[in-house]
């Protein structure tokens, strides 16, 4: 089911004004990737990028074309792990975050 433009705009607005929500969204994207839910991880990451650093600025830092990054994170994109981890590193550094992975039993 496709999300409406209004919903996406609401999410972006909240990411911009709510630090806890922004951090939780990045964590949710990373969790999705680690759980093998690649499409979900990419979708959340796109929203996060749109609301924070933006694809143009990200492309300058990562030294890749912004359209290439958008395609990589699009519904049909197939990003390599090194690209995903590079993007996550840039995002966490940009927001002055430290990411930890905690392993527990299910």
Residue ranges: model-predicted function:
Residues 50-71:
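Short alpha-helical DNA-recognition segment
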Residues 76-89:
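Short, basic-rich loop-to-helix N-cap that marks the start of a DNA-contacting helix
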């Amino acid at each position: 089911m496709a999300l409406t433009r209004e919903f996406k705009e609401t999410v972006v607005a909240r990411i911009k004004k709510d630090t806890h929500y922004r951090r939780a969204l990045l964590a949710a994207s990373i969790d999705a990737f680690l759980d093998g839910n690649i499409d979900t991880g990419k979708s959340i990451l796109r929203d996060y990028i749109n609301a924070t650093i933006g694809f143009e600025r990200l492309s300058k830092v990562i030294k890749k074309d912004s359209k290439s990054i958008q395609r990589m994170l699009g519904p049909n994109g197939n990003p390599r792990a090194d690209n995903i981890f590079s993007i996550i590193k840039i995002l966490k550094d940009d927001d002055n975050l430290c990411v930890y992975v905690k392993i527990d039993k299910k």
